[in-house]
Structure formats: structure tokens, C-alpha cells
A protein has these predicted regions:
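Glycine-rich flexible loops
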Residues: 1-120
Length: 120
């Protein structure tokens, strides 16, 4: 699972995602929780992102205050839930997503700069 693939799945699942985390979400591979290795890997991801997913463990999010950080975490969680539900109802297929052109239109209208590395 890559930062790009995970971010695209979230962005394509809920309209507010590209507005709330236009830089994307980092993905940390599975590591023993609570140790120095996961702390160092997370700190590297946080140089680029406001949030990092810990594979098979959880989410780390950072922001200027509690409300913004909680909103970020909630948006990621909600979008992931939508993605999982759509996959489970569609037999593993996703039949409709927010296109890259639509993502760019959202970014334009909300005045945010998307991470273009994550778009086709």
C-alpha cells in the first residue's frame, strides 16, 4: 500500500478529502507499535503530510489545534469507512468515483493545491 494509492482511494470516496488533506496521507508499513522504529518512520512521513496511517494499527494526525486535527482524523476515518462499504457492497469493484478532473475542480474552487504526484 502506497501513499498515492491510499490517498487516491480516500480522495475519490468523499468530496471533502482533497480540501481537508490536499497533500495526501502517508502510509507507514506495519511495525511494532510504540517503538522507536515506528516513531522515526512516522516523523519522516509527517514532514510531507498532516496524517499518517499505521498499517494494521491506526492513524496519526497533527494540526494547529484540537478542532482542526480532530476534523482531519474524522474526515480520513469517514472516507475510509465509505471506501470499505462501497467495496463490500460492490463485490470488490468500485463503480463510481470522483475523477481526477473533478478533484482538480474541487481544489480550484476551494483554493487548495493538490499533490499532483497523486493524480493521473
Amino acid at each position: 500500500l502506497t501513499d498515492r494509492d491510499f490517498t487516491r482511494a480516500l480522495w475519490q470516496s468523499a468530496t471533502e478529502c482533497p480540501v481537508v488533506f490536499p497533500e495526501g496521507v502517508g502510509v507507514c508499513p506495519w511495525m511494532v507499535p510504540g517503538g522507536a522504529d515506528i516513531a522515526m518512520a512516522t516523523s519522516e512521513l509527517m514532514k510531507k503530510y498532516q496524517a499518517a496511517i499505521w498499517a494494521q494499527h491506526g492513524l496519526f494526525a497533527s494540526g494547529p489545534d484540537f478542532d482542526i486535527t480532530f476534523g482531519l482524523a474524522h474526515t480520513i476515518e469517514k472516507s475510509a469507512e465509505i471506501y470499505v462499504k462501497v467495496l463490500s457492497m460492490g463485490g470488490g469493484l468500485i463503480r463510481q468515483t470522483i475523477t481526477d478532473d473533478d478533484l482538480r475542480a474541487i481544489a480550484h474552487d476551494f483554493g487548495v493545491q493538490l499533490n499532483e504526484e497523486f493524480l493521473d
